[in-house]
Regions:
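Membrane-embedded alpha-helical signal segments
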Residues: 1-172
Length: 172
């Protein structure tokens, strides 16, 4: 990890300042050049949140239905919760995904986001919710039959660009 760009940022933990934490993740992921990482900021329960996931690796409908809508629909008593307890409060009372846990380390958040999970960062909270939202193309990258290549790679892609990128992410 020493020769990786932003390795020092990966060793850090969430600060609880939503703007600073999202900017750190944007730097680690190389935004705006890396357009596959989605940052979806929104307000719910009287505080600010941001969902972060990899397009093509996470099911966007699952993110919308079980995370964004669930947080918007559940405002009852959320403003009375202490900032540090917001993640646990949402985990127990709002999020409808059973495979969810709290995480505070950037390295683990980045690893899981790239693997298809969604991180929910919450303003004032040093823990993020990490939720199972994986869903991607399931075929293996295969050799082409119709095009024989003498030198070089022989893997073939016939789907959309987004699907092909997702297949390569899983392959690597």
């Amino acid at each position: 990890m020493a020769d990786m760009p932003h390795a020092d940022l990966l060793r850090g933990e969430l600060t609880g300042a939503l703007e600073k934490d999202t900017q750190t993740l944007r730097t680690i992921f190389g935004l705006p050049e890396n357009a596959d990482i989605v940052f979806r900021p929104f307000d719910a329960g009287g505080f600010s949140l941001c969902a972060v996931y990899t397009e093509g690796m996470a099911q966007s409908d699952k993110v919308a239905d079980f995370i964004l809508r669930a947080c918007h629909a559940f405002d009852a008593g959320a403003d009375a919760v202490a900032p540090q307890a917001r993640a646990e409060y949402l985990l127990k009372n709002a999020v409808c995904i059973p495979q969810a846990r709290l995480e505070e380390r950037f390295a683990e958040l980045v690893r899981q986001i790239l693997g298809g999970m969604t991180a929910l960062l919450i303003d004032g909270c040093e823990d993020a919710l990490l939720m199972e939202t994986r869903g991607f193309e399931k075929r293996a990258v295969q050799r082409t039959i119709s095009e024989s290549v003498v030198v070089g790679s022989q893997e073939g892609f016939v789907e959309s660009l987004r699907t092909n990128i997702t297949l390569m992410r899983r392959y690597v």
